[in-house]
Amino acid sequence: MAKLTKRMRVIREKVDATKQYDINEAIALLKELATAKFNESVDVAVNLGIDARKSDQNVRGATVLPHGTGRSVRVAVFTQGPNAEAAKAAGAELVGMEDLADQIKKGEMNFDVVIASPDAMRVVGLLGQVLGPRGLMPNPKVGTVTPNVAEAVKNAKAGQVRYRNDKNGIIHTTIGKVDFDADKLKENLEALLVALKKAKPSQAKGVYIKKVSISTTMGAGVAVDQAGLSASAN
């Protein structure tokens, strides 16, 4: 068995794995245990009551967190004409069509999000093998294929998070940085849960949001008692 580091021993002593913590207590615990030498992200894992083997029960989408994620996001947009100017005005770092595709084929991928107008998908579609494995392929379900590319750029810059359940029916995403005020982290988490509830598949039966855990990049997960969240989120 691998030897526990001093840091992990402290975390295990502080975090009761059998307990669901009030959200304020959970956030305070994360902040106390965040001793890494960088500003750790606060991540969330949401266990959903879905059968992930069935395509009609998979959950995928995007939502803008009220206080952002604390990360700067570089955006690439495939579009042309007036939309290209609108995308640039909205803050996109890279805008183009075939010229942008050529850059990507050469391995020049200095961006975090790819957005495309519908008329550009003929170009983007040829990049599936490059963008797909990196989770960058534009998709209308998460708002990255849209005629309104300027709005999509603004959303990405404002702290939009994209979510998709894994094979175990769990959503993994981020809700901010450990130096965020506790209220901001709580409100970001509540906004995410509201979005997930709106995305609930009609075929999903029983308890939908089964478990919510938050953690820092280098820390252990802390289970959150949903009763302490706003009525719309729990």
From Swiss-Prot:
Gene Ontology annotations of biological process type: regulation of translation; translation
GO molecular function ontology, one term from the record: tRNA binding
Keywords assigned: Repressor, Ribonucleoprotein, Ribosomal protein, RNA-binding, rRNA-binding, Translation regulation, tRNA-binding
Organism superkingdom: Bacteria
One GO location term (cellular component): cytosolic large ribosomal subunit
Pfam families, alphabetized: Ribosomal_L1 (PF00687)
Subunit structure: Part of the 50S ribosomal subunit.
Protein role: Binds directly to 23S rRNA. The L1 stalk is quite mobile in the ribosome, and is involved in E site tRNA release.
Family per similarity comment: Belongs to the universal ribosomal protein uL1 family.
Protein name (Swiss-Prot/TrEMBL): Large ribosomal subunit protein uL1
Encoding gene, per UniProt annotation: rplA
